[in-house]
């Protein structure tokens, strides 16, 4: 690979790192061609981009990017694949689902919405992270529930009051 080609790859990686709020680093070494193809299909279905990258080029792209990747560059040893997604937990779900059939891919680290996770033990934590849309949905649901409770109380309360008044008027009448 010439210097110009390396510079182009670094530039492309830097742009991808800047565009995506969710970046996972995984080790897919040891997977045969069929398993790798199945992993790529699973990533495509989950709207996750998967690419094998050279550690040195990715490290330089991380340095050039405006984000603070903290300890993440320290995991750039051995085989590294980068998984990019708009959703924070999509790559983790793909990895967890795929590991039901195989020991790989191993999670090396992740950068999710400015938070850094290093190591495979964070996989379950990352699977349970809610996406921005899910959190917004939960907040909207919480905000709507008190209003619904007040409306239902008024509806049921109004019926009770009318029933009591009717009963009292019948007793007097």
From Swiss-Prot:
InterPro entries linked to this entry: Ribosomal_uL10, Ribosomal_uL10-like_sf, Ribosomal_uL10_bac, Ribosomal_uL10_bac_type
GO cellular component, one term: ribosome
GO terms for biological process, alphabetical: translation
Superkingdom of the source species: Bacteria
GO molecular function: large ribosomal subunit rRNA binding
Family: Belongs to the universal ribosomal protein uL10 family.
Protein name per UniProt: Large ribosomal subunit protein uL10
Quaternary assembly: Part of the ribosomal stalk of the 50S ribosomal subunit. The N-terminus interacts with L11 and the large rRNA to form the base of the stalk. The C-terminus forms an elongated spine to which L12 dimers bind in a sequential fashion forming a multimeric L10(L12)X complex.
Sorted UniProt keywords: Ribonucleoprotein, Ribosomal protein, RNA-binding, rRNA-binding
Described function: Forms part of the ribosomal stalk, playing a central role in the interaction of the ribosome with GTP-bound translation factors.
């Amino acid at each position: 690979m010439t210097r110009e080609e390396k510079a182009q790859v670094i530039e492309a990686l830097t742009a991808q790192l800047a565009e995506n709020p969710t970046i996972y680093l995984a080790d897919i070494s040891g997977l045969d061609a069929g398993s790798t193809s199945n992993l790529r299909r699973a990533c495509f279905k989950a709207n996750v981009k998967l690419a094998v990258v050279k550690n040195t080029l990715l490290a330089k792209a991380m340095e050039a990017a405006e984000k603070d990747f903290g300890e993440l560059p320290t995991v750039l040893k051995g085989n590294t694949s980068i998984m990019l997604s708009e959703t924070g937990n999509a790559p983790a779900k793909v990895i967890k689902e795929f590991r039901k059939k195989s020991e790989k891919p191993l999670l090396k680290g992740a950068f999710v919405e400015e938070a850094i996770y290093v190591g495979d033990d964070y996989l379950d934590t990352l699977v349970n992270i809610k996406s921005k849309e899910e959190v917004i949905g939960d907040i909207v649901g919480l905000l709507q529930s008190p209003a619904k409770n007040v409306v239902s109380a008024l509806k049921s309360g109004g019926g009770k009051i009318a029933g009591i008044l009717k009963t009292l008027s019948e007793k007097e009448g």
